[in-house]
């Protein structure tokens, strides 16, 4: 209404605003604050709901769920989405009733049972099972089994295996994961999950490694492999196989984006074990760059600089560590040791004393050496 005139919406403009599943991405529609109607075909409506999920508030999304249920009452999708909203609000009775209604009305009964299993499983993982006693892992398993009885899809057996894993039934979960590698569901993920089950069964390291090798091998064929290189690298690191771990970490680094500071820190730890100082310096620098407020990383950087006699760089890292955490003894201890190496005796004593005051038992021994 820029010039104070009220204008009627142009009829052609209204026609152009015809809703399709991808209209969520349309800038013109996003600028109108009115909640757009769902498309008239189920698939397009599901697409739009999926896109809307990250763009709207939970309450607005719940209204879409209601609209979806009224437009497509025989689709299992709407009931699941609305019940998830109710679960988040701790309205468990209402969520349970809605899922039961969905099972009665849905054309694809297998999907409805599987959705119910998933809702219970997610709720227990994130909120525990003490709240709302009717929802147990056993009930989730029963729902997944009903889905499989109606339609023998391997995905429903996979769901049951994942619930068994959370329940602590590791052998049962392992057996199913391995069975499923002979189905259309074959993926690196199945071998990775089987490896996790074996780990919890305290199996020999070699058995776990063979499963992780399979996860990498299958993952390479399907193009979904980064996380399996990372998982195998972490496993090899735990086994003290640092050189092989680094090879896997390097593969992960070459294909995964974005990479977290924790990753670079883990690889740095392996590199220092092998005295690979140059790559270790690069990785601890990357770690600190990506996590500029984490004092322990700067302490590690200062510590490595001390080891490789880069005293000025080390003093800079230790000083930054102290700025971030004035009560963290390691920063003062490292700064003192670096200053001692630089011949700055007075400052070294001052910082080592500060580390001692903050409870570092090593500082006293170093102080004797400076004096």
Regions found by a protein language model. Name each.
Residues 9, 61, 95, 140, ...:
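Single-residue signature of alpha-solenoid repeat helices
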Residues 26-27, 44, 78, 112, ...:
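TPR alpha-solenoid repeat register
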Residues 54, 88, 122-126, 166, ...:
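Register position in tetratricopeptide repeats
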Residues 67-68, 101-102, 146-147, 179-180, ...:
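Canonical positions in the second alpha-helix
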Residues 73, 107, 151-152, 185-186, ...:
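Short coil turns that delineate tetratricopeptide repeat
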Residues 337, 341-371:
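Terminal, low-structured helical/coil segments at or just beyond the last alpha-helical repeat
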